[in-house]
Regions:
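Hydrophobic faces of well-ordered beta-strands that scaffold small-molecule active sites
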Residues: 132-134, 204-206, 250-252, 340, ...
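Substrate-binding/active-site clefts of carbohydrate-active enzymes
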Residues: 137-202, 209-335, 356-362, 379
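Conserved residues at the C-terminal ends of beta-strands
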Residues: 207, 226, 343, 348, ...
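Aromatic-anchored helix/helix-loop segment that forms the rim or "lid"
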Residues: 420, 424, 460-481
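Carbohydrate-interacting/catalytic domains
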Residues: 1-137, 141-143, 149-153, 159-163, ...
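Aromatic/acidic polysaccharide-binding cleft in carbohydrate-active enzymes
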Residues: 139, 383-384, 436-471, 487-526
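Short, solvent-exposed loop/turn segments at secondary-structure junctions
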Residues: 139-142, 210-212, 256-257, 333, ...
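Active-site-proximal helices and loops of the catalytic beta/alpha 8
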Residues: 240-249, 257-258, 263-274, 328-330, ...
Length: 622
């Protein structure tokens, strides 16, 4: 909102503190209508979402500011976490008036209210909040030998050729069963820990590693057992220990909303010798699933019959996953993991997530719990329920899909103002601890490869074409230039930079399974990797990039710039996402200025820095 404005929640003249408020904290609101409007009264109109209560607080006259009259009030945030929606009401002595909401003055209709998040303060583990995450799809990262899948759950087979495409064509029944494996292993990951450390990695987030019939392993067969194609529990303990020696923690993927139909729990095909819920109503797991009636009709995740949905409220299931002394969450943390990422957090009840958080922190004092949420997690509605993910007792933070969406929109031709607005909305809505612990990324196992997205115009229409698609030299050159910009934003923006395996060496691919190819050992784009490693090193070195706040300096057209500062250190990021030269000027009251990426030095003139950025060029100034 540009000057002059009546109320802007991001302006300290109108609201302090910025953004979310801690339970019980005092929040100061000030409105500044033009005196010529004739308003003599102003009220703050609140609605507390979880309490279901409304409140109207009259603001007191607070003098004049030029041609504006000021109204102010100090509001004490509730003692319990809450989501508050608010707008203002103005009226004159003659009784006439109007409301003020995010769109401006209005005299009718439902106000489009501002949001105030009220949260209970909690601490994010420092190893995560100031680190860099590397996401691995375990089957596709590194294999040391070709394993034999004979005798394992599921009709699995292993590619002999590491460089082949994953299978994507449906079988004769029209199903893509994901039974083709490449043989990546935990020992393979261990063998590359030094290279990951050189990249700046401080945490490994691994897609599921427990026994499963599918290569993605999101249909768990046995939570107590490492999938034999990956290794065993001793390999896992060794991975965690050796990673920690290099300053790297391990984050596991918790898939607790559903299991696999081929699992020790459901056992639809009778592979396991014990009785599963699909075989007998006397199974110890029978109350984990909902049948309509037993055994052929049952609840499944999104109706996919190979993914029977779990009843999270089944007492024995809660004890097995969370509450028990040797629960799944606790036992794998004791085995060496440092945290969990909850798959499909929207599908899990809030009380379940709260219990999981408690178990994580009981098992490991600096344990981490993050969640897969694709939208703004502060006000998410899932299955008609407003969620409380970030209010202090559930998740430490979430995967920041809004960051990826907004950044890619900007890099692919959108206005920089949209990137800024999307990120400022998240900063305003999230508790600061959660905002600065956002898992920021350019791609995951659920998105197309970042280089492909940036280099190509549109995806080919047919899956056949997408399977064989490769960027042309011209497309790859443009995509690489934009990838460098995207990586610069990733490593310099508040949050935890997260790299999906292979993005740092120029892997390509559209949607699943083409985004889950094997790591191209010996064929890496080393120039891209060196650039990522440089950025990872700079983040480790510079306090401002790990802890600094953010202030936007420019966000217009194809140019974005922001500054982060901490303990007297400043880092300025400037991004030109356009295909032509851009100029940028800023105050720089210091003697010298260096682009920390290229080493190029700039000399301020009369305290002003005048920069020329070429097409698709970015700078990190310090």
């Amino acid at each position: 909102m540009s000057e002059p404005f009546v109320f802007d929640p991001r302006c300290e003249l109108c609201k302090t503190p910025f953004g979310a408020a801690v339970c019980g904290q005092e929040v100061l609101f000030t409105c500044r209508p033009l005196a010529s409007e004739g308003f003599t009264h102003c009220a703050l109109v609140l609605h507390r979402e979880f309490a279901g209560q409304g409140q109207e607080i009259e603001l007191s006259p607070a003098g004049f500011l030029g041609d504006r009259v000021c109204f102010s009030t100090a509001f004490s945030a509730p003692e319990e976490p809450e989501l508050i929606w608010y707008h203002f009401r103005f009226w004159r002595d003659d009784g006439s008036g109007c409301d003020l909401d995010r769109t401006g003055y209005r005299s009718d209709g439902q106000p489009l209210s501002w949001q105030l998040t009220v949260y209970r303060r909690s601490t994010v583990p420092e190893w995560y909040g100031e680190g860099m995450v590397y996401q691995i799809f375990p089957d596709r990262f590194r294999r040391l030998s070709v394993p034999d899948p004979k005798g394992l759950v599921g009709n699995r087979w292993v590619h002999q050729n590491w460089d082949e495409n994953p299978v994507w064509r449906p079988d004769p029944d029209g199903e893509v069963r994901n039974r083709d494996f490449f043989g990546g292993s935990l020992k393979g990951i261990i063998s590359k820990l030094d290279e990951l450390a050189e990249l700046g990695v401080t945490a490994l987030y691994m897609c599921p590693i427990f026994e499963s019939a599918s290569n993605h392993r999101y249909n768990t067969a046995d939570y107590t057992k490492i999938d034999p194609l990956l290794g065993d529990e001793e390999d896992f303990k060794s991975l965690c220990a050796r990673a920690k020696e290099r300053g790297i923690r391990v984050i596991l993927d918790g898939v607790f909303n559903h299991t696999g139909s081929q699992s020790i729990y459901f056992n639809a095909d009778g592979f396991y010798p014990s009785l599963g819920a699909a075989q007998s109503q006397d199974s110890p797991y029978s109350d984990w699933f909902s049948f309509h009636p037993w055994p052929d009709d049952y609840d499944a995740w999104w109706g996919i019959r190979t993914l029977p949905a779990v009843r999270e409220d089944a007492a024995s299931y809660v004890d097995y996953i969370i509450d028990g002394e040797n629960s799944i969450i606790r036992r794998w943390l004791r085995a060496g993991a440092s945290g969990w990422r909850l798959d499909v957090a929207d599908e899990l009840p809030g009380w379940f997530i709260e219990k999981a958080r408690k178990a994580v922190e009981e098992a490991k004092s600096d344990g981490l719990l993050i969640g897969e949420v694709w939208e703004d997690a502060s006000n998410k509605i899932a299955y008609s329920q407003r969620r409380k993910y970030l209010l202090g007792s559930e998740l430490h933070s979430v995967m920041n899909y809004p960051f990826r969406t907004a950044l890619l929109t900007f890099l692919k031709g959108g206005d920089a103002s949209g990137f800024r607005e999307a990120m400022e909305t998240i900063r305003e809505n999230y508790p600061p601890e959660a905002f600065y612990a956002n898992m920021n990324f350019l791609g995951t196992h659920d998105t197309a490869r970042i280089l492909t997205v940036l280099g190509a115009d549109e995806p080919p229409a047919s899956k056949e074409e997408r399977a064989s698609f490769r960027l042309s030299p011209v497309q790859r050159e443009r995509g690489t230039a934009l990838l460098r910009l995207a990586a610069l934003a990733l490593f310099s923006f508040p949050g935890v930079p997260t790299v999906y395996y292979g993005d740092e060496v120029g892997m390509e691919g559209w949607e699943d399974p083409f985004n889950r190819g094997t790591y191209p050992w010996g064929r890496e784009d080393t120039a891209i990797r060196d650039y990522f490693a440089l950025l990872g090193g700079l983040r480790k070195q510079r306090t401002s990039l790990r802890r600094g706040g953010i202030r936007w300096m420019e966000a217009q057209g194809r140019l974005a710039a922001y500054i982060r500062e901490s303990a007297g250190e400043r880092s300025v990021t400037v991004l030109n996402a356009g295909d032509s030269e851009q100029s940028f000027e800023m105050d720089w009251p210091w003697e010298t200025c260096t682009d920390l990426v290229s080493g190029q030095k700039f000399t301020p003139v009369d305290g002003r820095l005048i920069l020329k950025l070429g097409p698709y060029e970015g700078l990190l100034l310090g």
